[in-house]
Amino acid sequence: MFTKAAFSSLCASRHAPISVAVRGIANIPAHEYHIRFDQRVGRKRPAQDVLDRFKRLNNGMWIHAHPGRHKLRYMKDETWQKTSLYYETCTKEQCEILDKLMTPYWLRPKHYPNDPYSAYHVRHNIDSPRVDDRGNFVRERKKVLMDDSTSQRFFKDC
């Protein structure tokens, strides 16, 4: 039936190593690694993945849910189950990257009724100047004409 050469070539082709596709730059979809532009309108499009996974606060910080918070919860201890439901803040570099992926509409402050994040839009007890997306100084409360030590002693933002 089979000659020895035909049988050996058949076995050799069966045991040939399988080439596995590596996720290099050529295999990453184009929308994942660059800012997209709408061809009809001719302006930048917001990255939908960022809108789905992150929330931008009115002070310019981005927050996101704890990764893996719904995975194998029954195996985790109670402390992890409690803290995994918290939101995490992004670093300064991450916030800058996320701002570049968004359009100016999403960088403006948003005011929603019954916003669950309303307590987090104002940063408390931070002495550094607050700057909005245009570089303008932003105040959380009305300016009081007194020195900072007196205002910190008698006036609280809480």
Swiss-Prot record:
Keywords: Mitochondrion, Ribonucleoprotein, Ribosomal protein, Transit peptide. InterPro entries: Ribosomal_bL35m. It comes from the Eukaryota. It is found in: Mitochondrion. One of its GO terms (cellular component) is ribonucleoprotein complex. The keyword Mitochondrion applies. Belongs to the bacterial ribosomal protein bL35 family. This is Large ribosomal subunit protein bL35m. It comes from Caenorhabditis briggsae. The lineage of its organism: Eukaryota, Metazoa, Ecdysozoa, Nematoda, Chromadorea. The gene is mrpl-35.
